[in-house]
Amino acid sequence: MSWLDKLLPPKIKQTDPKSRKGIPEGLWIKCPSCEAVLYRNDVEANLHVCPKCDHHMRIGARERLDGLLDPEGRYEIGQEILPVDALKFKDSRKYPDRLKEAMDETDETDAMVVMGGAIHTLPVVVACFEFAFMGGSMGSVVGERFARGAQNALEQNVPFICFTASGGARMQESLLSLMQMAKTTAMLTKLSEAKLPFISVLTDPTMGGVSASFAFLGDVVIAEPKALIGFAGPRVIEQTVREKLPEGFQRAEFLLQKGAIDMIVDRRKLREELAQLMALLTRQPADAVA
């Protein structure tokens, strides 16, 4: 027995590994900002916002939609649209192999989920990026699901909301992915002509072709706190201009200060804030909204 073993009380000595077999893995999460060790269930109940420092962690598309939409009357749009390898693209790995890996890891078929439903009884269509699926990259499926979501909003005469979380256009689809920038913005023109609100919610990260196309075209542009928002990443810009960028450059607070976005809203207050905005923009009563 070492001198340390003699000093340590029996209760805090290392537990026998055999006695830990019944403890499930993944019970704890470490906050990437303040590094606090947090109980996973508490973090999930808090919509993946750190209760210690209010850092907004990344959240899955379906989990976000579950916390946003009313439980009744939800329906998914465009889930039957699946990705194809039209260009037979291959870098270090084949595109179908990357797709299969992403599908297995996320249980999604591509990087966007679109649902119709209601927020505080106000009807709406919501598109939500899944960043865990190939970095939320925008390819043909994402563009088509976005377009069908906007079309559904037109047919139902309801507002359209999009939560962005993307690294940009999908490299493996080349020109086809770049075409989605034009496709998505064209659909928003139809919404504008019909005088239907489009609300864009920028989450961490919103970059590349997504930020350069529809992300900033909302009638109201909202961002989550400290979200990274821009076209090229800060390291790429620094290497190009050979200068040190200002502190907080490309963060939501910096963009709000420069007038590039309209407001920053805490994720835990987004449901109520969106309902109030929808009621205001559509001139409907929002009596149910707290």
UniProtKB/Swiss-Prot annotation:
It is found in: Cytoplasm. Keywords: ATP-binding, Cytoplasm, Fatty acid biosynthesis, Fatty acid metabolism, Lipid biosynthesis, Lipid metabolism, Metal-binding, Nucleotide-binding, Transferase, Zinc, Zinc-finger. Binds 1 zinc ion per subunit. The keyword tRNA processing does not apply. Residues 27-290 form the CoA carboxyltransferase N-terminal domain. Acetyl-CoA carboxylase is a heterohexamer composed of biotin carboxyl carrier protein (AccB), biotin carboxylase (AccC) and two subunits each of ACCase subunit alpha (AccA) and ACCase subunit beta (AccD). This is Acetyl-coenzyme A carboxylase carboxyl transferase subunit beta. The lineage of its organism: Bacteria, Pseudomonadati, Pseudomonadota, Betaproteobacteria, Burkholderiales.
